[in-house]
Amino acid sequence: SGRSYGTSYLLSMKDLNTIDHIEDLKSIDSLKIEGRMKEPAYVANVVKRYRKALDEGTDQVEREALQKTFNRTYTEGYMFGEDPGSITNIQRPNNFGYEIGTVRGSFKGMYEIALTKTLHQNDIIRIDHENEDVNLSVARLYDQEGKLINQADDTCYIKIKEKLSPGDVVYKTKDYLFYKGLDADLDKEFRRFPLDLKVYAYPGAALVIDAE
């Protein structure tokens, strides 16, 4: 159409998320989880959420858990009538994260952040300042008295060298404790059992494999 998109990421696809349509998908014999070039924690998280949705249905807790690993926001895809113009996130090619609060202002050499979701020490966040990202790992988290804390639920204070403004939106891109849980799941020894295979292969005949 001749439109200019500047430096936008035209091939940056949103993540396909059909968990709210799990009842429509149950008749399919096998669901493929897209994990190419994704970290093990991403695959573990998505498989776990869809497995639980298939067995027990889904709820808001499971929907929010999906957001805690890599995503470029979500699309329901062509199968469920998504507008073709809405399947890409042209603003960014990397992890979008999920919103957890806003910058309220500066206070004693730190920035005060009003939280809508819990923030833990060692979480990784990004702050949208004038359409530019400020990314940091929360190595130190403070309360209003300047005391170090491990987590905050409503208001916290962080030392950030970059300039920020009141109203800048804060996103969490990595939940430290959530990832520790996923890593523990990945480290578990899965049950192993013996399997006897007999393979029959003859020229011009179909390959037959018997498993016992």
Task: Tell what function each PLM region has.
Residues 1-212:
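Surface-exposed amphipathic alpha-helical tracts and adjacent flexible/coil segments at the periphery
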